[in-house]
Amino acid sequence: MARVKKAYKIITFANTTAAMAMESFCLENNLPGRLIPVPQEISSGCGVAWRVPVEDYDLLEVKRSQMNFAWEQVIDLMM
C-alpha cells in the first residue's frame, strides 16, 4: 500500500543557528511543525529546514514579525 503524500510548506534557513531558533520559537509559542533534513528537491544553505502542514502555515506567518531570525525560502512540497 502506497503512502499518501501530504502538502507541506518547507522553510529553509541560511544557517543552523536560525533553524534552531525557529525550533525554539515554535516550541515556546506552541506553533506547529518540526525540523527536518532539507529534502533533495531543494537547495539550502544549512541543510536543515522547518516543515509545517500547509493548513497551519498561516499560524507561523502571523508570528513571523516577532521572530529575530530570517527565513531563506518558503517552498510548497508534497511529502
Model features per residue range: what roles?
Residues 40-46, 76-79:
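Short proline/glycine- and acidic-rich turn/helix-capping motifs at secondary-structure junctions
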Residues 1-2, 36-41:
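Short, flexible, solvent-exposed loop/turn segments with mixed acidic/basic and small polar residues
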Residues 15-32:
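Short amphipathic alpha-helix segments
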Residues 3-4, 46-48:
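Short secondary-structure transition/capping segments
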Residues 51-79:
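C-terminal structural segments of small proteins and small subunits
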Residues 2-12:
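Short glycine-/aliphatic-rich beta-strand segments at the starts of folded cytosolic domains
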Residues 32-38, 72-73:
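A short linear hydrophobic-aromatic micro-motif
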Residues 10-12, 47-51:
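Short aromatic/hydrophobic contact patches that present stacked aromatics
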